[in-house]
Design a protein with these regions (language model features):
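Phosphate-binding/catalytic loops
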Residues: 93-153
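Generic structural signal for well-ordered, non-membrane alpha-helical segments
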Residues: 15, 19, 85, 89, ...
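Residue-level signal for beta-strand positions within conserved beta-sheet cores that form or flank
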Residues: 1, 32, 102-105
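Glycine-rich, phosphate-binding/catalytic loops in enzymes
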Residues: 22-24, 73-76, 126-127
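Nucleotide and nucleotide-moiety/phosphate-recognizing core
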Residues: 3-5, 13-69
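Glycine-rich beta-strand-to-loop/alpha-helix junction loops that act as flexible
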Residues: 6-10, 112
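Helix-loop-strand module that forms the ligand-binding subsite of alpha/beta enzymes
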Residues: 62-108
Length: 153
């Protein structure tokens, strides 16, 4: 299963760097059929990038929600927010399907973070623990392909 992993966020803003950190760790595993992109935010160009992949996984920090992380399928939405400079996973997926006839399934992994306001701060210890668990989960998910394990409740 060809997979595109897009890790996004600002590593210079504490826990906002969780998405890129996860993407870097997964890329280092050297898994087959995996392409990793890292950026500060999603944009409309990511819709083109999804063409030819079976699955796209969007990795980002989560300001709220389940700890240590959540993993869910993205439903493409016509009303999803996006502009020429930033987009949501649902919006990018909808564009990929509408403009490029991409058959990709989309998923979001949101890693719970706690501190986003201090520029230059590293990822907090609590968020690092969440990140470790998210890396283990995603590595297993990518290794087993179609049989995606359930995320923690």
């Amino acid at each position: 299963m060809r997979t595109l992993l897009i890790g996004y966020g600002n590593p210079g803003r504490g826990d906002d760097g969780l998405g890129p950190a996860l993407a870097e760790a997964i890329e280092a595993l050297g898994l087959p059929d995996l392409k990793v992109d890292i950026d500060f935010q999603l944009n409309v160009e990511d819709a083109w990038e999804m063409n030819g992949y079976d699955r796209a996984i969007f990795a980002d920090a989560a300001v709220e929600g389940a700890e240590p992380f959540f993993f869910k399928e993205v439903v493409p939405e016509d009303s999803a927010d996006f502009s020429s400079h930033s987009a949501s996973p649902a919006g990018v997926l909808k564009l990929a399907r509408n403009l490029f006839n991409a058959k990709v399934r989309g998923f979001v992994i949101g890693i719970r973070g706690y501190e986003f306001d201090v520029f230059g701060a590293p990822i907090t210890p609590r968020a690092q623990d969440n990140l470790r668990q998210a890396i283990a989960f995603l590595a297993e998910t990518l290794r087993v392909g179609e049989k995606e394990p359930a995320a923690p409740a």
